[in-house]
Amino acid sequence: MSQDLSLQKFGFIKRDTPRTVNLDPLQTGGLLTPEAREALLEWGDGYSVCDYCGGMLDQIKTPPIFDFVHKSLPSFIGMDHARVTNGARESKFAIMHAMTSPGDWIVMDGNAHYSSIVAAQRARLNVKLVPKTPAPDYKITPEAYAAAIEEVKQQSGKPPALALLTYPDGSYGNLADAKAITNLAHDFGVPIIINGAYAIGRMPFKGKDLGADFVAGSGHKSMAASGPVGVLGVNEQYAAKVLQKSPTHKNKEIEFLGCTARGATIMTMIASFPAVVERTKPESWEKEVSNARWFSEQMESIGMKQLGDKPHNHDLMFFEGTVFYDISQKTDRYFLYRELKEKSIHGIKPGLTKNFKLSTLGVGREKLGFVMDTLKDIIKKYDG
């Protein structure tokens, strides 16, 4: 049977991205474990997890979704209650929608991800951004949060309904003083969300220890899961609001539209969970931070400056410099991407030469050394 010509570009599509070394901050924490790859095939059908479902996703005993959501996950993220969502942005919106009314204010850091702002806009909130310090640090300080909250009070006559802290931010990998900021928010009577999309699943993280009332995490970004999938954490004080059930469909939680991640998404998260727990132990994370700092030093030795926290405390880093940009002016703007692709190194976006961000999570010192040797060889090739 001949196939419609317009359909031939669909069907199975092979990925041609080089993946011997992956430095893409969006991808390093979401690389599937071998167990998750098996789960992807076993549970890939849309409603596969619903073979023995009684009407509530989080109550499914076979597979052990109930134990994961109600026992393992709250302990792992350090919160009283947890839910699996369709991503960190969905977690943030669910919290905002449950906790606020249209026209309320939310204060969030100036390094916040765009999805935090869009989630607030979807909830019909006014957004006050906390200024970051100037280059090269781009820090978020408790004092700046206090000033922003005071400005909202003066403008609206009351404190903001919510605050949000990005921990770490997705541009520079900065880890703000979360405990000081959450304490300050609470002094003003403001509950606070910690967006841990680049923390939960990558590094040690306990929301209550940081003073969070709510947390949002990303499975496909940081928990070795197939997306879209995320996590939401809430403490007992606000659980009734965020986890409220429908008055007409009494086993369905309103903010999650009943059920969220099904099939491959939640099952790959569960399959990777033992490995994720292991890699977030302090001793494992210390090695990751050591590798990131080593790589930062090596990059600075060739003329690229690392921005943000120094010494750095996260795998995500932002670099800027002219060494590759100057070469691009003599060749073309895509030369760096092309040269790295030939060595099967992925992660720096095509066309970026003057500034770019990358992640060293899980790459290891040997492969990071290979990346540095490759970058040095590229410089010699064009400037030698």
From Swiss-Prot:
GO BP of this protein: translation
Keywords: Protein biosynthesis, Pyridoxal phosphate, Transferase
Annotated pyridoxal 5'-phosphate binding sites: A88, R89, N195, S218, G219, H220
Pfam family, one: SepSecS
Catalytic activity, reaction form: O-phospho-L-seryl-tRNA(Cys) + hydrogen sulfide + H(+) = L-cysteinyl-tRNA(Cys) + phosphate
Origin superkingdom: Archaea
InterPro entries xref list: PyrdxlP-dep_Trfase, PyrdxlP-dep_Trfase_major, PyrdxlP-dep_Trfase_small, Sep_Cys-tRNA_synth_arc, SepSecS/SepCysS
Example of a GO MF term: Sep-tRNA:Cys-tRNA synthase activity
Annotated EC: 2.5.1.73
Modified residues (N6-(pyridoxal phosphate)lysine): K221
Co-factor(s): pyridoxal 5'-phosphate
Group of enzyme by EC: transferase
Function in brief: Converts O-phospho-L-seryl-tRNA(Cys) (Sep-tRNA(Cys)) to L-cysteinyl-tRNA(Cys) (Cys-tRNA(Cys)).
UniProt subunit comment: Homodimer. Interacts with SepRS.
Cross-referenced NCBIfam families: PRK09331.1, SepCysS
Family, per entry: Belongs to the SepCysS family.
UniProt name for this protein: O-phospho-L-seryl-tRNA:Cys-tRNA synthase 1
Organism: Methanocella arvoryzae (strain DSM 22066 / NBRC 105507 / MRE50)
